[in-house]
Amino acid sequence: MNIKISNANQPSWKVINVKSHIPEALKKLDELAHNLWWSWNTEAMQLFASLDGDLWKKVNKNPIDLLRSIDYDRLIELSKDGETIARMDKVYGDFRKYMDVKPDAKRASVAYFCMEYGLNHVLKIYSGGLGILAGDYLKEASDSNVDMVAVGFLYRYGYFTQSLSMDGQQIANYEAQDFDRLPIERVLDKDGYQVIVNVPYPNFMVHAALWVANVGRIKLYLLDTDNEMNSEFDRRITHSLYGGDWENRIKQEYLLGIGGMLALKQLGIKKDIYHCNEGHAALCNVQRLAEYVESGMTFDEALELVRASSLYTVHTPVPAGHDYFDEGLFNKYMNQFPARLGISWDEFMGLGRTNPDDKGEKFCMSTFLCKTCQEVNGVSWLHGRVSQQMFKDIWPGYLPNYTHPNHAERSHDEWFKIYNPHPEESHVGYVTNGVHFPTWCAKEWQAVYAKYLGKDYIYDQSNSKIWEKIYNVPDEVIWNTRVLLKNKLIDYIRARFRENWLRNQGDPSLVVSLLDKINPNALLIGFARRFATYKRAHLLFSDLDRLSKIVNNPDYPVQFLFAGKAHPADGAGQGLIKKIYDISQRPEFMGKILFLDNYDMQLARRLVSGVDIWMNTPTRPLEASGTSGEKALMNGVINLSVLDGWWYEGYREGAGWALTDRRTYENQEHQDKLDASTIYSMLEQEIIPLYYARNRKGYSENWVRTVKNSIACIAPQYTMKRQLDDYYDRFYNPEAARFKTLVAHDNQLAKDIASWKESVAQRWDNIRVVSSERSENLQNGALVSGKEFSVKHVIDEQGLDDAIGVDLVIMSGAEGNEEIYSVMPMNVVGREGNLYTFELTSSVDLAGSYKVAYRMYPKNKNLPNRQDFCYVRWFI
């Protein structure tokens, strides 16, 4: 038998790429789609939706995917449609007018480094608040027309997509991104080939392909190692955000800092200021130091220039947010740099240690940045104070206070004025985070604001006078806008639950029962954030009987929405999600407490505009900022929060609700129970009655008044416009001005400062107090309030020329809780050779028990702050 049942060889496939052919008349659409400006321009998004509404939803509102997927016949039809062409021309005209404005040359230019960017849900290169903040920042930089460039990663898988099993277990799904379907472009060289950045790791080379995301006027350059030039292990460097082990983490941070700087150098880009948004980008300063040294400068001279042009923003006081590397692992990747820098390995390691002499201490990226950046800042008033305390041991001899004044209603400027009563003790500052208004404000609210505040309100977002016009908006407009957005959210939730139930093959009768219990007329409270334990998502469930009475009141119904992801390695966070899910499935809570999976930017926009109350309950003071509440208030949503992060500054009586900023119990479990009871009481006695106090027109006048107060009194202070302006006023422009003086005349001042520091360091141990004289009352420690005392010290400066300063430092408070009462500078009143005479006459106004000591330090008018050269000697 010669005939076989089958006879076939394996196919050999050839990959071909079919690009969508966009008719010439519609070419402008492609340019619009490749600039993320569309993501915060309502008319642009409406334009894309009008091409094919069903397909627009199917491609998850991704214009690149839309243009690739739309039927060619439909494109031909649209190219001949006058209305479509007119709409496209209008949007494109607005876009070109926006793009063609030249950057503001009066402001410093900035290179911005961050591990993640939340620009739009279709570009999955973010995980949470840090990335969203960075994305908003680039958008506002574009809107404000500043000269900025950004560097990050193009992740193949990004952060995980979350789903829940039928029993409430978090499932982390990693879905590969198709880069050709994203609003990004390859960076091409002059020959039309994609630019490859060759990053020299020890003993091997990593080849990073370079992409660009156009964020309005700002270019975000993205490094991508997932290509055939790299080994399997190196391709993984840009696979996942915060994925892998510690070795992959250091490879990522090496690529971001060193590879990012090499990318900018290859593109010919130099900026005035280099801003490290979190510690992940710390190694950019290693590369910058190396380049200065290799240009002929000493390490100390190079450090002056790098420090003077660098800013480090810290985003968390939580230890897990600061990367520490074992010396062995750090040496594996960084051992070539000491020779390039002209220093020893121990000196290099010391830059990342709080105590450089502690050989057992790991290398901390945050510590390294504190030592190589002139300026360091937290992301809210309170977080700035916490950061001063967190980093104080890096600059021994200075005593920043952790205490803070009782909360009071103050303007943003007033908070800044009371920030640091003793600025000589710490240079660590703050800029309170804001949010990008066009991204997070629902189009329905934008229409209200444009009508009643004036169309130009968007260009002057931080002007409180403009926002006061909200009081002129009819109450019915405020209430109806809130109801409209809540109904849209409810419809979205119902669709999500149906889809998820079908995907999990759940009992259809259960989902029908659940959806029937969702009440669009109920007071709706939202809680959505990263599920770390300090966020205290469990707080509401401390007393289930009391909670059941709240949600099951037939006359005043209340519903709660929860959303958020826990890191795949965070078992406790995942346990919280399961606990909430399990409670939500109990009969008394079914449809009253809902957990929505896969919290991303798309869901976040719906939540912050659709709920009535935004709840935030972190363990104080671990919430650095917490911008979701800022997004909510711009949409007429009222905040209920712990006085922490931005809300410590933002809270105003009559414009939201706050838990006290004072801790009652040291035991955290007891404090949690007290805070939970407080929340229940506020809901029962204030919030719920206020919401349901309806007038004859069916709305609560006092609720609307609270919404208006929230918008008028708080919103203008928490825009990204205000945040960007603060960075320029407090950090970028002053640093750039100082840097300009340092590099003038072939870096002469930088060289002079480095030489002066070397001279002081050589003499420091020999500088001595020759004699001291004190008034009798000070000598005996028996001062009387209001009565003067005097002191005189003669100091041998060992040949230095008026380079020493002396403070009298007075401390108050019990042992372990001391605070600075006063820092009194002593004055130089005479000189004989190397001997300088310092005198002080002063008094203490308040009776009490104090400690006093004298502090000697080097002084130089060209230093930006005392921590820049932290030599201190105490004496009594």
Annotated model-derived regions:
Residues 1-876:
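Catalytic cores of carbohydrate-active enzymes across secretory and cytosolic contexts
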